[in-house]
Amino acid sequence: VRLNGLLNFSAPFPSKKVQHVSIDSTTENQATEYVLDGDALDLFFREARTANTFTDEMVTDEQLRAIYELTKFGPTAMNIQPLRITWVRSAEARERLVRHMAEGNRAKTAAAPMVAVLSYDTEWHEQFPVFFPHAAERKAMFDGQDELRAVMGSNNGHMQAAYFIMAVRAVGLAAGPMGGFDAAGIDAEFHAGHNRRTFMVVNIGKPGENAWHPRLPRLDYDFVTATV
């Protein structure tokens, strides 16, 4: 269902907010600016949203590999690649994960065909010779710089997570990214002995019955952008 134009929030919200939000997903006046067709734009952006239920159709190893093979091409600072993915498939591993999820996220995490735990590697700079071979010596810039590496790892890991969600959609699946969990508990459970910091958990699969909440408003272009 497409809802066009501005939402009227005069009752629950101050009227000055109305001009700043909309859920217009038709964008007819920008149609000539896109190189992707409408179906592709809907798949990736306009009709895509967080899935909360899934069918029991299995997510294959081939699909998981395909997701990463797209994710890895997204740009990052200095081509660093701090994202690490833990696929939680087995019932035993899923049970261990669920106990670290917030109450509202437990049932859907337990039921999803596949769950990905996304983390960033705090020692990502060790791979400089692989991802920056023409200037591998720059690894030394980050030796002993724990705080700087953590900031860069988190920032670029989150950026890679956005590519990851798009890649999930590209293989015909739906993503349900979540932030309600005990990150330290998940790290102790799955990343002991590794330099990884969990920052997102993503349920993956074919969307099930009543998978979507209604589309919430998005801030308008004129409110978000400035030209200088």
Predicted regions: what they are:
Residues 6-9, 13-228:
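Acidic, surface-exposed loops and disordered segments
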